[in-house]
């Protein structure tokens, strides 16, 4: 089979056996489906937008970038975030899946940051192979192994009194969150999604408990 990776426009896709889409933001995938209903297609490149591992506040002067999934556009925007990319392809059974750019951080192409940043931070893993938060998002929905991952870490000195968005990536049916000894809501996990709570930061501890079929199976 012949395939092609397209960043826009249908002309180059017409002779291909398998259409490859580089970024749903740049391609009219739904229109192509109507125009070429028999065309096989996949995501030949879709961004993760993962940012700097362990960083939850932008500091571009230090080369630090928050993951796009947690930016104001949100995970349901088409703008460069891992969650929307996976949802888009999972919701469309006529698409064969996707390749994420990238698996690892790499030297060069620091977009959207400038010097002193010298490398891309869009990897699912950092330069040393340590998983970023978004690796746990994918593991939640790509494996049957129970997953329960909390972010951010709770060592946020300097942000005392600030309202913090606490997220959980998990494939549990429900998750209950406790912040500094106070239980917050127990929430059902949406398919291919995440859960979030707001809490005012004070030093202490955050705990999550995951439930399957009404039974506690994980605690973090």
What are these regions (language model features)?
Residues 216-220:
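Extracellular and select intracellular beta-sandwich modules with Ser/Thr-enriched
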Residues 1-188, 194-215:
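Extended substrate-binding grooves/exosites of carbohydrate-active enzymes
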């Amino acid at each position: 089979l012949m395939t092609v990776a397209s960043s826009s426009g249908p002309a180059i896709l017409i002779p291909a056996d398998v259409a490859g889409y580089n970024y749903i933001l740049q391609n009219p995938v739904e229109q192509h489906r109507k125009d070429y209903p028999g065309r096989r297609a996949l995501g030949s490149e879709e961004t993760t937008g993962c940012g700097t591992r362990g960083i939850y506040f932008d500091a571009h002067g230090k080369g630090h970038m928050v993951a796009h999934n947690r930016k104001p556009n949100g995970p349901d925007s088409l703008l460069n975030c891992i969650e929307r990319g996976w949802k888009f392809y999972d919701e469309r059974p006529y698409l064969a899946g996707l390749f994420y750019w990238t698996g690892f951080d790499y030297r060069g192409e620091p977009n959207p940051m400038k010097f002193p940043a010298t490398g891309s931070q869009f990897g699912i893993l950092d330069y040393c192979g340590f998983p970023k938060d978004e690796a746990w998002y994918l593991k939640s929905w790509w494996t049957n192994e129970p997953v329960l991952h909390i972010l951010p870490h709770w060592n946020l000195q300097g942000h005392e009194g600030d309202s913090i968005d606490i997220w959980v990536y998990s494939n549990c049916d429900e998750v209950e969150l406790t912040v500094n000894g106070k239980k917050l809501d127990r929430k059902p996990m949406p398919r291919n999604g995440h859960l979030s709570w707001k809490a005012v930061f004070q030093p202490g501890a955050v705990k999550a408990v995951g439930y399957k079929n009404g039974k506690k199976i994980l605690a973090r």
